[in-house]
Amino acid sequence: MSKEKFERTKPHVNVGTIGHVDHGKTTLTAAITTVLAKTYGGAARAFDQIDNAPEEKARGITINTSHVEYDTPTRHYAHVDCPGHADYVKNMITGAAQMDGAILVVAATDGPMPQTREHILLGRQVGVPYIIVFLNKCDMVDDEELLELVEMEVRELLSQYDFPGDDTPIVRGSALKALEGDAEWEAKIIELAGFLDSYIPEPERAIDKPFLLPIEDVFSISGRGTVVTGRVERGIIKVGEEVEIVGIKETQKSTCTGVEMFRKLLDEGRAGENVGVLLRGIKREEIERGQVLAKPGTIKPHTKFESEVYILSKDEGGRHTPFFKGYRPQFYFRTTDVTGTIELPEGVEMVMPGDNIKMVVTLIHPIAMDDGLRFAIREGGRTVGAGVVAKVLG
């Protein structure tokens, strides 16, 4: 089994299918695994294996998602597909399946439909950086002009939401015909895989990003100073480096004088590791859970932002009643709750359980944040919603 070992050295990229119901997302997912397995090796997955997606929980929300994997000669892909529209909304907002790029499936027989638009908008709001289009069911359209018209509509729609519509790769194919083994249409799946390789850049690994550690706990160690603990979210912290303590209070500077893990002293702490960081000249009471340690200048505290949120339905353990403007829940960021007020979009009077909505949030304390940060909405410790920072406002 030397092949397995070899795969690990390939860059790993996360993708997923998005688009309107019944436009062929799951069929395309099956076709990609089947055609690539046949061409480059790997395991094919049948349509029905993908379609009955298992339930998973992300931030207390139940989502049905199918995960498949496939390889091209240069990369390894993890691919998510969701059976229902609501699952997509939840998946994208919670970031349960973070996508480095998405394949937008549009049936040539229908053209763009309401969920096509909604998924593109969600992609923009939650920070899906790249979209490739698969124009499906092209075997059912004889009219070249009609295909060109649909293509133009899709490009315009992408441009409307700030994706580069004119430069977006569009593949004309038939997922069903490819799945049935028709060579002409199989070639279109290979073409799509080629665009995944060339159009979606290799994602930056967490370890290569600037250092950030959400503070979970603070201890005072007599004779040594103050230690904060938490899991390094990204980057590397080395002994002797300057750090900033950001959020809740005024930003403070300090120097890391020690890193420890499992009571052992280390030279550095890396993304994914649970560590204690010893800070010079900081008193125990000057720092608290909910702040972050970060590489100086890389993240700022903010109180106001535009967000895209999903409100849990009653069945999911959420609220039983709608809420209105002036609603003041807690927003849970990384390790702490902060109270905030909301502004609803113009013309929206109330939000029902099960809805997804754009809202502007103003927090009572600043939190270290960037666009794309995920949060939960809570009432008295119970999760009632999930959201993502679409745009920091102040």
From Swiss-Prot:
Any one Pfam family match given in the protein's UniProt record, by short name: GTP_EFTU_D2
Keywords: Cytoplasm, Elongation factor, GTP-binding, Hydrolase, Magnesium, Metal-binding, Methylation, Nucleotide-binding, Phosphoprotein, Protein biosynthesis
CDD domains the UniProt entry points to: EF_Tu, EFTU_II, EFTU_III
EC category: hydrolase
Recorded catalytic activity of this chain's protein: GTP + H2O = GDP + phosphate + H(+)
Annotated ranges, domain tr-type G: 10-204
G2 as annotated region, ranges: 60-64
Any one Gene Ontology BP term: translational elongation
Alphabetized InterPro entries for the sequence: EF-Tu_GTP-bd, EF-Tu_GTPase, EFTu-like_2, EFTU_2, G_TR_CS, P-loop_NTPase, Small_GTP-bd, T_Tr_GTP-bd_dom
Sequence segments annotated as region (G1): 19-26
Identification of the protein by name: Elongation factor Tu
Gene name for this UniProt entry: tufA
